[in-house]
């Protein structure tokens, strides 16, 4: 009994599988792709109407190849699944209701392309099916004439039948160019062909008979021709021999054969070639075979005739070479007088042509140089354009991968970046930054007299108020102290700039000074139990060292110095930092009174034995230390006032309960007051951290805690938000996944191109194509996914055959601990072998 084959298996060809892979809804999508590849009508279209569009394969192709903002409308009897940027209608194209729906959707628009891939329900009889298809095409043409713009395209499917020629004639009346084609995706056994009508004429009025199937497909009776009509009345002219040619045998010479313009025609008419020239007869190319062939040409075959043509070519070369040698000999035999006359004429001509040739040569050289420069400029422009396009492509890829925001690039750093303190290295760069653009100020000051020193009104008021408040002695002390400061600054500014060492950045202040860090480390070290006995001795040594430092600093302050004259250089004033000139008035007064001596010559600092003087000294030392600490050690070196760094605010990361409590506090003032009132309870203690044992504090925190008045739903909401935040991948992981996805997509596109090339190849069989496609997808890693294997640990005492455990689906593998140990041992052996080879 014969085996029955599958009915629809032969229909699953390469385009069926390609449609499955590329995501098209039907294999007919490739028909439209191939038609568009040939006629290029989708790229220029702004509006498209697809009749009989289900299931939507042609709509997918149109949405892919047309501009993004195009209008695409699809109509069919059956519903079409929605597509992005596509409008679908469920109507019958043969009814007036469909025309009204299209007018409502298109409004005043005219479409550029009308597609029709419709076919009736076939199966009754071939004649009936062909007529139904032609009638459907005529109705589609009627809709196309209503909505198609001038110069538009109409692509329709037609069956090859007796109604095909009338349809073609109607198309030719309405369109400028009509072409019938059958794309490669259309099956060979199918009777369908596609007619592409381009250049719609858009007549003002179309005869309704064109769209009437009774008139369009009416059979025209052809009158039969009689026998007398078939017989031609004029007798044709008799063709005989050439005039004067009475014989069939023609003998020609080899010279005529060499001079013939068409040697093939000459051989077809000649019967014999006689070699009458002795020199040509003795030529090495004239062999015995050639002589025999020349005796009877009519009996020669293709090979012998080709040898005669080659023989003719060799003889012609020989004769041409001989004629050149004879002409050369004739030129040499000219008389000497003629040669001399010729030389004189040539010399005169050369003298005339020399400047002209030189000018032409220079002009040619100049043109060549200009052309080279222009080519270099064009190449440079191309290189810059390519670089710009490459950067734009990279930026676009980064934006698509969400590595950058649109318009903001983290990777691209221009020449002018943001200001950074880390770029300032050394005092010179710092002065350039602080000075800024002072050209306008220098110009203004240069126009004024040199002797004037300008002080603002506010400074004048401060000075007058200070002079009125202080006694003469205190005022003298303040002036002496300010003179000392100015003299110290002048000595510092006179240091050579070349001796500056580029140290650390003066604007970057560390969180803690080195001395403070060293002191903290030392205190941690000496807080150990081994140093507990020598604590008193260390305190005494520290007090002695502090007293010595205090005494030395007071002696330096009490030394009288002659005040130098105040500086009048405007440039120095401009460079002087604000932190040194502006010292608090109270501090200057205190320091000044400490440094001034009595009129009798006795210093105030000598009475150190009394308690009052010692206390005053300590207070003044504290004030001076406070001033120095406020100005910092860098104030004298760099000319900037260093402000003490405040501790940054420590942000706490709140748990869900804390967030819910914060929401309650932020939403209601009354709830906030209630929370503050409830915080004073019996569970609240005022112990500082570290007073109680750690185990006791943890136990109290666990068991003696008051429940917060927050909603469970609110806490669960914030807990869910935390889970979502924690579930997000970090930026590097997201970028890596995006890069991996981009590589896979790129590899997939390359594989698709190769697969299309393999599919379009005609020389190989279908089996070889399938094998090549399978190997391509396997190399690209796009084959079948590895099936999931469930590992089941075997128990002792179970045989080789193990039943499927409960709850395990799919493929499973039985493993045991012995197998795992064996595999590890095998891996260790392989590792040892590798080390030995190295």
Curated annotation (Swiss-Prot):
User: What Enzyme Commission number(s) appear in the record?
Assistant: 2.1.1.-
PTM sites of type Phosphoserine: 333, 335-336, 532, 545, 576, 667, 679
Q: Location of the Glycyl lysine isopeptide (Lys-Gly) (interchain with G-Cter in SUMO2) covalent cross-link?
A: 571, 634, 650, 669, 701
In terms of SUPFAM superfamilies, this protein maps to:
S-adenosyl-L-methionine-dependent methyltransferases
Q: Which GO terms describe its biological process?
A: RNA methylation
Q: Name one Pfam family in it.
A: FtsJ
Domain of life, per the record? Eukaryota
Q: Coiled-coil annotation: which residues?
A: 730-768
Q: Where is the composition biased (Acidic residues)?
A: 336-348, 457-474
What InterPro entries does the annotation carry?
RNA_methyltr_RlmE, RNA_MeTrfase_FtsJ_dom, rRNA-MeTfrase_E, rRNA_MeTfrase_SPB1-like_C, rRNA_MeTfrase_Spb1_DUF3381, SAM-dependent_MTases_sf, SPB1-like
Task: Report the subcellular localization.
Answer: Nucleus, Nucleolus
- List all Basic and acidic residues biased stretches: 813-829
Query: Where is the catalytic site?
Result: 157 (proton acceptor)
Q: Which residues bind S-adenosyl-L-methionine?
A: 56, 58, 76, 92, 117
GO MF term (any one)? rRNA methyltransferase activity
Which keywords are on file for this protein?
Citrullination, Coiled coil, Isopeptide bond, Methyltransferase, Nucleus, Phosphoprotein, Ribosome biogenesis, rRNA processing, S-adenosyl-L-methionine, Transferase, Ubl conjugation
Gene Ontology cellular component terms for the protein in this record: chromosome; nucleolus; nucleoplasm; preribosome, small subunit precursor
Location of the region described as Disordered in the Swiss-Prot/TrEMBL record: 332-367, 453-482, 537-639, 802-838
Regions of compositional bias (Basic residues) in chain numbering: 802-812
Q: Which reaction does it catalyse?
A: a ribonucleotide in rRNA + S-adenosyl-L-methionine = a 2'-O-methylribonucleotide in rRNA + S-adenosyl-L-homocysteine + H(+)
Q: How is it modified after translation?
A: Citrullinated by PADI4.
Which residues does the record list as Citrulline (modified residue)? 390, 774
Known role: RNA 2'-O-methyltransferase involved in the processing of the 34S pre-rRNA to 18S rRNA and in 40S ribosomal subunit formation.
Q: Which family does it belong to?
A: Belongs to the class I-like SAM-binding methyltransferase superfamily. RNA methyltransferase RlmE family. SPB1 subfamily.
The UniProt subunit note reads as follows: Interacts with NIP7.
Name the UniProt record assigns to this protein: pre-rRNA 2'-O-ribose RNA methyltransferase FTSJ3
Organism of this sequence: Mus musculus (Mouse)
Q: Which gene encodes it?
A: Ftsj3
């Amino acid at each position: 009994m014969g085996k029955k084959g599958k009915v629809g298996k032969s229909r699953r060809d390469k385009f069926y599988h390609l449609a499955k892979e590329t995501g098209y809804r039907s294999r007919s999508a490739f028909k439209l792709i191939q038609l568009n590849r040939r006629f290029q009508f989708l790229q220029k279209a702004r509006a498209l109407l697809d009749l009989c569009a289900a299931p939507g394969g042609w709509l997918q192709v149109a949405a892919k190849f047309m501009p993004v903002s195009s209008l695409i409308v699809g109509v069919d009897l059956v519903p079409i699944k929605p597509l992005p940027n596509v409008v679908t209608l469920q109507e019958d194209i043969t009814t007036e209701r469909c025309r009204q729906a299209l007018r409502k959707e298109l409004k005043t628009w005219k479409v550029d392309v009308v597609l029709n891939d419709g076919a009736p329900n076939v199966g009754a009889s071939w004649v009936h099916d062909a007529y139904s298809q032609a009638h459907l095409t005529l109705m589609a043409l009627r809709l196309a004439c209503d909505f198609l713009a001038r110069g538009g395209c109409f692509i329709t499917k037609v069956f090859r039948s007796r109604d095909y020629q009338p349809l073609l004639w109607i198309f030719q009346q309405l369109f400028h160019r009509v072409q019938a084609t059958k794309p490669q995706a259309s099956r060979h056994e199918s009777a369908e062909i596609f007619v592409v009508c381009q250049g719609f004429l858009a007549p003002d009025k179309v005869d309704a008979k064109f769209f009437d199937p009774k008139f369009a497909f009416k059979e025209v009776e052809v009158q039969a021709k009689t026998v007398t009509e078939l017989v031609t009345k004029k007798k044709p002219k008799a063709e005989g021999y050439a005039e004067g040619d009475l014989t069939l045998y023609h003998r020609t010479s080899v010279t005529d054969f060499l001079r013939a313009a068409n040697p093939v025609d000459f051989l077809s008419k000649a019967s014999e070639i006689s070699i009458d020239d002795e020199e040509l007869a003795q030529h090495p190319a004239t062999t015995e075979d050639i002589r025999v062939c020349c005796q009877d040409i009519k009996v020669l075959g293709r090979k012998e005739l080709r040898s005669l043509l080659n023989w003719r070519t060799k003889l012609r070369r020989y004769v041409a070479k001989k004629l050149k040698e004879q002409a050369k000999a004739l030129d040499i035999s000219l008389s000497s007088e003629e040669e001399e006359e010729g030389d004189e004429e040539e010399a005169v001509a050369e003298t005339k042509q020399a400047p002209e040739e030189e000018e032409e040569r220079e002009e040619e050289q100049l043109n060549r140089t200009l052309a080279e420069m222009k080519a270099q400029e064009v190449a440079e422009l191309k290189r810059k354009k390519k670089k710009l396009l490459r950067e734009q492509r990279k930026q676009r890829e980064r934006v698509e991968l969400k590595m950058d925001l649109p318009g903001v690039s983290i990777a691209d750093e221009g020449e002018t970046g943001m200001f950074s303190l880390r770029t300032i290295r050394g005092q010179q760069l710092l002065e350039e930054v602080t000075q800024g653009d002072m050209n306008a100020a220098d110009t203004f000051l240069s126009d004024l007299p040199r002797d004037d020193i300008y002080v603002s009104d506010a400074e004048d008021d401060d000075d007058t108020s200070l002079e009125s408040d202080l006694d003469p002695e205190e005022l003298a002390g303040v002036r002496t102290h300010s003179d000392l400061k100015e003299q110290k600054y002048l000595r510092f500014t006179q240091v050579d700039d070349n001796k500056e060492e580029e140290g650390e950045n003066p604007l970057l202040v560390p969180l803690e000074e080195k001395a403070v860090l060293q002191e903290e480390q030392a205190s941690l070290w000496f807080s150990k139990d081994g140093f507990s006995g020598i604590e008193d001795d260390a305190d005494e040594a520290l007090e002695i060292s502090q007293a010595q430092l205090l005494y030395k600093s007071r002696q330096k302050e009490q030394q009288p110095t002659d005040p130098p004259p105040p500086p009048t250089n405007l440039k120095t004033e401009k460079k002087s930092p604000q932190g040194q000139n502006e010292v608090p008035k109270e501090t200057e007064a205190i320091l000044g009174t400490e440094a001034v001596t009595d009129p009798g010559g006795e210093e105030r600092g000598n009475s150190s034995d009394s308690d009052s003087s010692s206390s005053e000294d300590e207070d003044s030392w504290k004030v001076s230390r406070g001033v120095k600490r406020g100005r910092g050690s860098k104030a004298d070196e760099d000319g900037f006032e260093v402000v003490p760094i405040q501790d940054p605010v420590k942000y706490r990361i709140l748990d869900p309960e804390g967030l819910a409590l914060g929401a309650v506090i932020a939403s209601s003032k009354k709830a906030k007051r209630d929370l503050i009132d409830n915080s004073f309870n019996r569970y609240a203690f005022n112990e500082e951290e570290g007073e109680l044992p750690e185990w006791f504090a943890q136990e109290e925190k666990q068991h003696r805690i008051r429940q917060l008045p927050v909603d469970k739903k609110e806490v669960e909401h914030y807990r869910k938000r935390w889970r979502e935040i924690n579930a997000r991948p970090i930026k590097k992981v997201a970028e890596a996944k995006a890069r991996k996805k981009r590589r896979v997509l790129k590899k997939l596109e390359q594989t698709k191109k190769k697969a299309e090339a393999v599919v379009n190849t005609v020389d190989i069989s279908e089996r070889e194509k399938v094998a090549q496609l399978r190997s391509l997808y396997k190399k690209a890693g796009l084959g079948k996914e590895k099936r999931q294997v469930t590992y089941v640990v075997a128990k002792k005492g179970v045989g080789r055959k193990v039943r499927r455990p409960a709850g395990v689906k799919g493929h499973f593998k039985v493993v045991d601990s012995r197998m795992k140990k064996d595999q590890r041992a095998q891996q260790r052996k392989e590792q040892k072998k590798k080390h030995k080879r190295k």
